[in-house]
C-alpha cells in the first residue's frame, strides 16, 4: 500500500516538476528576485541607520508561498500540456507576467519603498493624463531605472540557457538519479509547505478577514511575512476593492440622519484651502532658508501653527480622515460617521467644492481616491456646487472661480473648499515658467546633491512659492468680508531632504521620513471684519498655535468656529477649544505591512528637522 501511494505521489505530485524542471526554476527565481533584493537592501539600511529605524522584512514565509505558487503554475501548465500541448505557452506567458511583476516590485521598492498593493491601483485610478505623463517623466525615464527592463531580458536568456543546462544534466547523469533527487527535494518542499499552512491555519484563521485588514495594529508581526507573498497581495487587493464599495455605501448611509444647527453668532464665510504634497520644512514661515512664503509673510492677521501633521501620507486616506467626523484613534472607521461638509449643509451652509484635481466628470465614483464624494447618494448631501473642469495651473482654477464667485456664493453663510494641485507629483509642472525664482545655483551649499537633484529641489521650492502666491490671491478675494481662511496640505513630500529621494515612501523609516511626509503647514487667516465681530475666537486661535494637532480632527475645529451644534462635535478634539486634549496620541496607520506608528513617540518633542545630509 505504501509502495502504491509512493507511485501515485510521484505520478500526480512530482510529474509536473519532472516534465518542466527548468520552467519551475525560472518561475521560482522570478518570484524570489524581489524577496532577495528587498531583504538585502533592508539589512544594509538597518546597518546604516540603526536597528530601530527600519522595519526588517520577514521573507521566510513568503519564500514558502512563492515555492507553492511556482508549483501551481507548473502544474497548471502540465495539465494543459497533457490536454492539448498548450501548457508550454501557458508557462511562458506566466513567466512573462511574473517578469513584469518583478520589475514593478523592484521599481516601487527602489523609488517609494513600497510593495504592490491596493494603494497603487488607487493611485493609478486617480491619475489623469497630465499627471501620468509627469509621473513617467519624473520616475520612469531615469537612468537608474533602466536596470529594470534588463531583468526581463536576463530571465528570457535564462529560460533558453537552463533548457540547455538541464538537457546536459540529463545526458550526463542517470535518469533514476535525477528523478530521485527531484523527488526528494520536491517532497521536502511540499511537506514543509503543507506543515506551515496547517500551523498558519490553526493560529491565524481570522487573518484573511476584512476586519483583520483594517485592524492591522492587532496582528502579530510574526505573521506579517505572509502578506508579502504575491498570492496574498492579489487576494488583499481584491478584498480591499470589494471593501471599498461597501465602505462608500456605508458612508452614504451615515449621511441619511444628520442633526445639525447653528447656535449663536456664526460666520459669513469659512474658506478651506487644501494644498498638495507640501512639506512645511520648505516654508520660510517655518524657518526655511529660501523665501518660499514671500506673499503670505506680508499679510496681517495670519496665524501659523507649528505642530500640525497629516493623518497619513496619501491623498485618498487623508481626504477620508479629515472629511469624516470619526478620528483615526477612535473606535469608528471613517465611513461610520458623517462627513463634515454634509453636516454644514444640513445646518444651513452653502457648501462649495472647487478642485483642480478631483473633478466629477473625470473621476470614478467607486474610487476612494477621488470619486467617493461624487457618488449620487453622497454628492448632493455634501455640496451645493462643484466645478466641472481642472486646469494646468492653480492660478487658472482661481481665475475661473473669480468669474462665477458672486453667483456661487450668493447665499450665506458659505463654506468654500478650494483644493489645489500645489506641489503634486512633478513640481516642475506646478508653476508657470515666468514664476521661476530659484535655480540649482541657489543650492551651492547642498554639496551632497548632483545638479539634477538640486534642480528638483529648486523646482519644488518654486512650486511652493507659486502655491504661496495662490493662497495670497484667495485671501485677497475675501479680505473685505467676515471670513476665516484655513490652509493646510493633505500630506507632505520628500525633496532630497535627508536622502536622495523624491515623493513619498513608507512610514516606518525613522523620524526624518515622518517629518518630511507628514509635517504640513497649517495657517489661519482672519479678516479685519472677523476680528472685530468674533474677538473670543481670535483669542482662542492665538492661544493654540503651538498645540500638537492632526488633521483628522479638523471637523471639530470647524464646528467650533462656525458655532454648529451636532452630536458629532467633540470639544476635546477642537484645536481652539479650552477642553482640547493636547496629549492625544497621533497614530499614523500605514499599509498592511507597516502597521501603525506613534508619531510623537518616534519624533519626540522635536518639531523641526535639518534639511541636508553628508
Language-model-detected regions and their locations in the chain:
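Active-site-proximal alpha/beta segments of enzymes that process anionic O-linked groups
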Residues: 199-447, 519, 551, 556-577
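Histidine-centered active-site/metal-ligand motif
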Residues: 282, 419, 423-425, 491, ...
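Metal-dependent active-site segment of extracytoplasmic phospho-/sulfohydrolases and closely related
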Residues: 271, 463-506, 558-562
Amino acid at each position: 500500500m505504501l509502495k502504491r501511494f509512493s507511485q501515485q505521489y510521484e505520478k500526480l505530485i512530482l510529474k509536473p516538476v519532472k516534465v518542466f524542471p527548468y520552467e519551475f526554476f525560472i518561475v521560482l527565481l522570478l518570484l524570489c528576485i524581489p524577496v532577495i533584493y528587498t531583504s538585502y537592501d533592508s539589512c544594509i539600511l538597518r546597518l546604516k541607520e540603526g536597528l530601530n529605524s527600519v522595519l526588517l522584512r520577514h521573507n521566510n514565509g513568503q519564500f514558502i508561498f512563492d515555492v507553492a505558487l511556482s508549483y501551481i503554475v507548473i502544474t497548471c501548465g502540465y495539465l494543459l500540456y497533457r490536454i492539448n500541448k498548450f501548457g508550454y505557452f501557458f508557462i511562458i506567458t506566466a513567466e512573462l507576467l511574473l517578469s513584469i511583476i518583478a520589475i514593478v516590485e523592484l521599481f516601487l521598492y527602489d523609488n517609494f519603498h513600497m510593495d504592490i498593493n491596493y494603494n497603487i491601483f488607487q493611485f493609478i485610478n486617480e491619475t489623469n493624463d497630465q499627471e501620468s505623463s509627469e509621473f513617467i517623466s519624473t520616475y520612469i525615464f531615469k537612468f537608474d531605472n533602466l536596470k529594470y527592463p534588463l531583468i526581463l531580458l536576463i530571465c528570457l536568456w535564462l529560460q533558453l540557457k537552463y533548457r540547455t543546462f538541464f538537457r546536459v544534466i540529463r545526458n550526463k547523469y542517470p535518469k533514476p538519479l535525477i528523478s530521485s533527487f527531484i523527488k526528494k527535494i520536491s517532497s521536502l518542499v511540499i511537506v514543509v509547505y503543507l506543515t506551515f499552512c496547517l500551523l498558519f491555519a490553526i493560529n491565524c484563521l481570522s487573518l484573511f478577514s476584512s476586519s483583520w485588514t483594517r485592524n492591522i495594529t492587532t496582528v502579530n508581526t510574526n505573521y506579517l511575512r505572509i502578506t508579502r507573498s504575491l498570492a496574498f497581495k492579489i487576494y488583499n487587493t481584491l478584498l480591499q476593492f470589494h471593501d471599498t464599495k461597501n465602505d462608500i455605501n456605508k458612508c452614504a448611509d451615515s449621511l441619511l440622519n444628520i442633526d445639525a444647527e447653528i447656535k449663536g453668532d456664526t460666520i459669513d464665510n469659512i474658506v478651506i484651502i487644501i494644498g498638495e504634497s507640501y512639506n512645511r520644512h520648505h516654508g520660510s514661515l517655518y524657518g526655511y532658508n529660501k523665501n518660499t512664503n514671500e506673499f503670505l509673510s506680508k499679510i496681517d492677521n495670519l496665524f501659523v501653527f507649528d505642530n500640525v501633521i497629516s493623518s497619513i501620507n496619501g491623498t485618498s486616506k487623508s481626504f477620508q480622515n479629515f472629511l469624516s467626523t470619526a478620528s483615526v484613534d477612535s473606535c469608528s472607521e471613517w465611513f461610520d460617521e458623517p462627513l463634515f461638509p454634509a453636516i454644514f449643509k444640513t445646518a444651513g451652509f452653502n457648501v462649495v467644492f472647487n478642485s483642480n484635481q478631483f473633478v466629477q466628470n473625470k473621476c470614478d465614483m467607486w474610487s476612494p481616491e477621488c470619486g467617493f464624494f461624487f457618488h449620487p447618494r453622497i454628492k448632493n448631501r455634501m455640496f451645493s456646487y462643484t466645478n466641472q473642469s481642472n486646469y494646468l495651473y492653480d492660478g487658472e482654477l482661481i481665475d475661473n472661480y473669480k468669474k462665477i464667485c458672486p453667483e456661487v456664493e450668493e447665499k450665506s453663510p458659505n463654506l468654500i473648499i478650494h483644493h489645489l494641485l500645489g506641489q503634486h507629483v512633478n513640481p516642475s509642472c506646478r508653476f508657470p515658467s515666468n514664476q521661476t525664482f530659484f535655480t540649482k545655483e541657489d543650492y551651492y551649499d547642498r554639496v551632497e546633491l548632483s545638479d539634477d537633484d538640486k534642480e528638483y529641489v529648486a523646482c519644488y521650492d518654486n512650486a511652493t512659492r507659486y502655491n504661496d502666491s495662490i493662497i495670497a490671491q484667495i485671501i485677497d478675494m475675501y479680505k473685505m468680508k467676515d471670513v476665516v481662511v484655513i490652509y493646510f496640505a493633505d500630506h507632505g513630500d520628500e525633496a532630497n531632504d535627508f536622502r536622495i529621494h523624491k515623493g513619498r515612501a513608507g512610514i516606518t523609516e525613522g523620524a526624518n521620513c515622518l517629518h518630511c511626509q507628514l509635517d504640513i503647514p497649517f495657517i489661519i487667516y482672519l479678516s479685519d471684519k472677523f476680528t472685530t465681530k468674533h474677538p473670543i475666537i481670535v483669542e482662542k486661535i492665538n492661544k493654540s498655535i503651538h498645540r500638537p494637532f492632526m488633521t483628522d480632527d479638523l471637523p471639530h475645529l470647524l464646528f467650533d468656529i462656525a458655532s454648529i451644534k451636532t452630536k458629532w462635535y467633540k470639544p476635546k478634539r477642537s484645536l481652539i477649544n479650552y477642553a482640547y486634549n493636547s496629549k492625544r496620541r497621533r497614530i499614523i496607520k500605514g499599509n498592511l505591512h507597516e502597521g501603525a506608528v506613534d508619531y510623537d513617540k518616534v519624533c519626540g518633542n522635536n518639531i523641526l528637522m535639518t534639511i541636508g545630509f553628508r
